[in-house]
């Protein structure tokens, strides 16, 4: 019993990936990619920006996979919002969108988003990049 307690205490803390996506099919696809390649990462789902804000107020988040077109707002604007808050500015964000636009790329870059990826091109390599991302995102002026 004591050995089990010691092992539990010494275990590496679990990372949490917040997936902000309103499409159930895309949620399941991302969850399958995460479960297959990243067993040590807990996946939390949010269907709206309001749900994402509530999650982040309560739980530590290691990375965010963010759709751009959500029922209650724009993912790129949410990335800017997070970049303006010191407690969230260092969280790596990947925008995963059906229709990435030049405007979205510009806004994402200004917020320090590490990748903007078309949903059809999204895969584990982008998650690896986010989990290994060490550089603090730039602050907006």
Task: Please provide the spans of the model-predicted regions.
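C-terminal output helix
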Residues: 103, 120-131
């Amino acid at each position: 019993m004591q050995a089990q307690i010691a092992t539990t205490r010494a275990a590496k803390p679990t990372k949490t990936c917040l997936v902000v996506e309103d499409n159930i099919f895309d949620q399941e696809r991302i969850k399958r990619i995460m479960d297959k390649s990243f067993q040590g990462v807990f996946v939390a789902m949010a269907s709206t920006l309001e749900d994402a804000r509530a999650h982040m107020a309560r739980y530590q988040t290691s990375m965010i996979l963010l759709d751009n077109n959500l029922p209650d707002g724009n993912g790129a604007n949410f990335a800017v919002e997070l970049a303006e808050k010191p407690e969230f500015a260092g969280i790596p964000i990947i925008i995963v969108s059906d229709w990435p636009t030049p405007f979205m790329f510009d806004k994402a870059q200004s917020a320090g988003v590490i990748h903007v990826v078309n949903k059809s091109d999204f895969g584990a390599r982008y998650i690896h990049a986010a989990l290994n991302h060490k550089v603090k995102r730039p602050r907006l002026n």
